[in-house]
Amino acid sequence: DNKNLIELITREVLSTFNKPSAKPQAAPSLKQGGANVLVVLTGVSNMREVFYREIEKLSGAKYDILLSDGAKAVFDKNELASKTRAANIYTSFQYSDRSEFLNKYDAVVLAFMSLSALTHISSLNTDSMVCNYLVWHMISKKPLIVSAEPLLNQIGDTRPAIMREINQKIAKLSEFGVSVVPL
């Protein structure tokens, strides 16, 4: 079907990029000055206060924030503006400006990986706008950094089959050149 065809084509494009002559750019040091970072927020509601604590770690970087539709229900734009040093907070975007928009950033950070985002990105599914941007950034071989720790902590050891599936998807992200980091 079309979904499988799109996935096969996208995998072929990624394999072309993965040739030794086209290695991904090294992730800039996000804690130092000079990095221009896009922080993407999804609707992981239980991580709201953690986000405000963790964003301070980017004190030396210039960063913007992009909110998914789910994040717009969790985060108030005015509160984000008052509690962070984000230069810009984006709540709407289009497919047509994707490349131009992403070219401004040295790295994209998905602050908290939701199960939905993990599934979309690891399968190269771009039917949500935020995941489309994340996959496109990954295809362009620029650093994509995600934190899966909250997702892993949420599932815990009680569901081994689910954890195995999640770990396989995280491993696939690593194969694609995504840096999966703890908080």
Report residues per predicted region.
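A cross-family phosphate/adenosyl-ligand binding-site feature
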Residues: D1-S128, V135-L183
